[in-house]
């Protein structure tokens, strides 16, 4: 019996009558309940199905089993019996065997041509390049199923006679020749001295083909992978690739601004037996040598056609997750610091719930908000919250956590199923779609650098997922959903979740999940990758559980910072030769217990780092949740301040008040209903919180704003801000919201062209400029957003109200506590109008009769005006018609040659004398 088998069935039959048959054996088991105890099993004679001899043998434990089959018959008071004794010895197998060649996976092949390891199959081959230096074998044994009383199952593994049990494998040097090398692996156990398992591994050599790729442009990105193993092929120090005969390699050649090419290269022999490399379209002959061969492959990329609809110069005020190339959320805008100085301006529900129909986190492009919800992408007005443009996406996102990213006139959104879709930033029309072959949730922030987009996906706690690099070029303007191929990808167990990359010109840093369930495994990593190839340059391994923060760079300390879900704050530097150095960490705390998780991307400034930390219960209020301040120089926690909910996202720091007060202000959202916006005040050397609110007897970080009613919900959104000090955010109410510095007053900084009206006319705002003056001193033209009476004017409209309607509510301090939901008064200003019969001849309502009024009548008659004119003001002739004769009279009046308009003269009877007549064409102006 192989040691993987343990189910024993017995059949027995006898031709005699009245004979009973029994199987008798001592049981083997992991516990004392059964182990060593005799068991008797009745065997029905001649049964068609066998009877299970349970616990005669153990799975994956080679302890032998002996069973006695006893036939018993009673006759005349005498018992007769016959015993048949059977011993079950075990043959031994390996649990698993895998191989790597020079760090890349090497596939084991059975004699029947199938791939992979099967314990009962004893002969394998593996094909490697003749140029390979080492083959590493990973060998595992059965260790889990010990019998009661055993300390160890007792397996030993030898490779060519050397015991490698403790190491779990061996590195086999390769001799650099074409000759096959043979390795013998044996598995032994003292409980089965005659059952030793012997495996034979034949290492076959494939002479390498040295491939030189010459590309145009020369800096195009080439990505090669072995189709069978999935392992990326990287060039040697001379820039050449060593490919093996009989192998196939997928490739992608990409460059920002060019059309990508992709396909499969196969190293094979043609019908004449010559060694060639082919991609199915082109064949490249190999110059063979004793050591393999060489070939040069020349590939030229075509420049992508220009898409004139894309404006690459559209500005962005907040282009991506943290609004900066460093991922450090530091700004200098004048954000509100006191509750009474701010207000919620608007809350627009664009989505539903908090999963695939949720509203996405926003960015700011060309003065507008770009976000998405469900399968729609939106451009939203920052002042009113009204949707300006709406367009369709290919499909929905997973949880709409990741904000879009803007670059070069395009917006990119991560969608479910490992998808990224590109849109025209102005029109929101689709440009292209990328779909990752491993799929996954799109929970990582997107980052664009030098024309390439970087992001990661997540499938499960233990599943593989990719981190990808994409050229952002619209390669085919004629297609709106062309399929984008990746410039490169890097696969990691556990994938990438909320882990955004820091991307420099010559390296990038990104964290991984730990690949295990829960958040205690010490197996996550910080990867240092080549941004052009995805090559792993260095890594920091064995980190504390999932890395679910973006990596931040702080120029002041020339270091990179991130946090872990296991409760650790990390710092590292990168050397000039792209290696990680000066690594250190700080264990986080919540003062209560449990794991002080952090998925918060640090904001770092002036030697201080600010992060959100979880309490003992992630969704339990006031259970130790806090904002933690790290003293970077001292490498310790300076202090922490409690919050109601876990500040699970990232802070926004403003330096706007530092010169005046020496303080910075840092803003975080609680991820717990109602989703409070809190602000921390801090300065260098501070060791205790000094800007707080009392909540239920607890001292918490200052509650600047509290959503109420339908707007109150959990909040997984890092705040962003514009130049006016307005913070934009979303929460699980599926609403996009704007909170900012309150409007202190409205000012009419330019009077409308018309301020005098006859009763019955309607107000014309042409020429008027209304300016909002904010509490932080900023000013803004809000003319397009104000409201006023649109009904006909009457005598009571001399003081004409202009108001700004987009205000809702705010918090208000009540001692050390905070009152939420306080209604914000609508800002308004009064415009003085003259409303009455009107000044005859004052057509434009500016209080004067002059040439401009005459010109307005001429424009009206020529149908060059979009508005109606007041008959009372314009019909100066009194004939009931507005025409050029009225314009002539106005010109005469303005020149002083006409004292009174005919329409103003007393009505005459038919017998009265005639008035002066003006000949047609005579303006009444002085002649030259």
Positions of predicted regions on the chain:
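Beta-rich interaction/scaffold domains
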Residues: 1-211, 216-219, 256-261, 301-306, ...
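Structured interaction patches on ligand/partner-binding surfaces of diverse proteins
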Residues: 36-41, 256-303
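A recurrent domain-boundary module in secreted/ectodomain proteins
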Residues: 201-204, 300-304, 731-742, 831-835, ...
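Short, acidic Ser/Thr/Gly-rich low-complexity loop/linker segments typical of extracellular
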Residues: 225-239
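Surface-exposed loops/turns
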Residues: 245-246, 759
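Extracytoplasmic/lumenal domain signature
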Residues: 307-359, 363-401, 405-742
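Cellulosome-associated attachment modules in secreted, modular CAZymes
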Residues: 834-928
């Amino acid at each position: 019996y192989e040691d993987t088998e343990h189910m024993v069935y017995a059949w027995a039959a006898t031709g005699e009558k009245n004979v009973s048959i029994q199987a008798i054996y001592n049981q083997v088991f992991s516990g004392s309940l059964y182990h060593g105890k005799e068991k008797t099993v009745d065997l029905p004679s001649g049964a068609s199905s066998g009877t299970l001899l349970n616990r005669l043998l153990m799975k994956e434990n080679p302890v032998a089993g002996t069973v006695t089959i006893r036939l018993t018959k009673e006759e005349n008071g005498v018992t007769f019996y016959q015993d048949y004794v059977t011993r079950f010895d075990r043959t031994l197998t390996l649990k698993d065997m895998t191989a790597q060649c020079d760090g890349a996976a090497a596939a084991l092949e059975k004699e029947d041509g199938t791939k992979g390891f099967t314990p009962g199959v004893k002969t394998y081959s593996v094909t490697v390049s003749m140029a390979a230096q080492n083959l590493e074998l990973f060998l595992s044994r059965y260790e889990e199923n010990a019998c009661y009383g055993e300390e160890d199952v007792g397996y030993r593994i030898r490779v060519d006679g050397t015991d490698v049990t403790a190491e779990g494998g061996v590195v086999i040097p390769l001799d650099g020749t074409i000759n096959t090398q043979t390795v013998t692996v044996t598995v032994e156990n003292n409980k089965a001295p005659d059952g030793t398992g012997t495996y034979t591994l034949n290492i076959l050599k494939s002479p390498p083909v040295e491939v030189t790729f010459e590309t145009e442009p020369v800096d195009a990105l080439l990505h090669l992978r072995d189709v069978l193993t999935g392992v990326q092929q990287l060039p040697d120090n001379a820039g050449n690739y060593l490919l093996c005969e009989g192998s196939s390699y997928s490739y992608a050649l990409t460059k920002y601004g060019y059309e990508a090419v992709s396909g499969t290269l196969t190293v094979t022999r043609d019908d004449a037996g010559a060694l060639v490399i082919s991609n199915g379209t082109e064949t490249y002959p190999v110059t063979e040598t004793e050591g393999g061969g060489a070939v040069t492959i020349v590939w030229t990329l075509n420049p992508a056609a220009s898409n004139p609809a894309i404006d690459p110069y559209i500005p962005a005020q907040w282009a991506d997750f943290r609004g900066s190339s460093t991922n450090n959320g530091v700004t200098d805008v004048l954000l509100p610091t006191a509750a009474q100085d701010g207000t919620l301006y608007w809350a627009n529900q664009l989505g539903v719930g908090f999963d695939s129909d949720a509203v996405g986190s926003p960015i700011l492009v060309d003065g507008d908000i770009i976000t998405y919800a469900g399968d729609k992408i939106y451009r939203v007005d920052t002042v009113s919250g009204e949707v300006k443009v709406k367009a369709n996406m290919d499909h929905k996102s997973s949880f709409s956590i990741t904000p879009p990213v803007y670059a070069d006139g395009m917006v990119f959104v991560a969608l479910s199923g490992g998808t990224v879709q590109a849109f025209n930033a102005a029109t929101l029309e689709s440009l292209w779609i990328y779909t990752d072959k491993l799929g996954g949730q799109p929970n990582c922030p997107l980052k664009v650098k030098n024309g390439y987009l970087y992001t990661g996906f997540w499938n499960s706690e233990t599943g593989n997922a990719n981190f990808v690099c994409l050229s952002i070029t619209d390669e085919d303007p004629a297609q709106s959903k062309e399929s984008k191929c990746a410039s490169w990808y890097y696969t990691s167990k556990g994938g990438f979740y909320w882990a955004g990359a820091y991307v420099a010109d010559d390296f990038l840093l990104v964290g991984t999940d730990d690949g295990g369930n829960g958040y205690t495994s010490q197996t996550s990593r910080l990867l240092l990758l080549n941004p052009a190839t995805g090559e792993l340059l260095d890594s920091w391994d064995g980190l504390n559980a999932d890395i679910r923060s973006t990596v931040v760079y702080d120029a002041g300390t020339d270091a990179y910072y991130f946090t872990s879900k296991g409760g650790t704050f990390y710092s590292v530097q990168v050397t000039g030769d792209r290696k990680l150095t000066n690594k250190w960490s700080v264990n986080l705390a919540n003062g209560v217990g449990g794991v002080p998780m952090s998925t918060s991307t640090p904001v770092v400034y002036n030697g201080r780092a600010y992060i959100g930390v979880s309490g003992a219960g992630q969704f339990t209020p006031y259970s130790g949740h806090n904002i933690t301040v790290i003293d970077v120089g001292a490498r310790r926690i300076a202090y922490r301040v409690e919050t109601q909910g876990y500040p699970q996202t990232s802070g926004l720091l403003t330096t706007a008040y530092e010169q005046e007060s020496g303080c910075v202000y840092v803003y975080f959202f609680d991820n717990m209903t109602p989703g409070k916006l809190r602000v921390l005040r801090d300065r260098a050397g501070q060791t205790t919180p000094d800007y707080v609110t009392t909540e239920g007897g607890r001292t918490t970080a200052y509650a600047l704003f509290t959503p109420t009613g339908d707007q109150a919900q959990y909040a997984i959104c890092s705040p962003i801000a514009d130049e006016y000090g307005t913070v934009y955010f979303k929460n699980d109410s599926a609403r996009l919201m704007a909170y900012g510095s309150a409007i202190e007053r409205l000012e009419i900084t330019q009077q409308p062209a018309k301020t005098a009206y006859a009763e019955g006319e309607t107000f014309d705002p042409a020429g008027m400029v209304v300016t909002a003056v904010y509490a932080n001193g900023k000013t803004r033209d809000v003319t397009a957003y104000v409201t006023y009476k649109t009904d006909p004017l009457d005598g009571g409209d001399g003081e004409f109200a202009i108001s700004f309607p987009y205000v809702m509510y705010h918090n208000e301090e009540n001692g050390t506590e905070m009152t939420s939901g306080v209604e914000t008064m609508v800002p308004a200003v009064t415009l003085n109008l003259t409303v009455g019969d009107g000044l005859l001849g004052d057509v434009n309502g500016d209080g004067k009769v002059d040439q401009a009024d005459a010109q307005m009548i001429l424009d009206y008659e020529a149908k060059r005006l979009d508005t109606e004119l007041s008959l009372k003001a314009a019909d100066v002739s009194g004939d009931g018609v507005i025409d050029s004769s009225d314009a002539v009279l106005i010109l005469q009046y303005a020149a002083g040659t006409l004292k009174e308009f005919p329409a103003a003269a007393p009505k005459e009877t038919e017998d009265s004398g005639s008035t002066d007549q003006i000949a047609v064409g005579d303006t009444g102006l002085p002649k030259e």
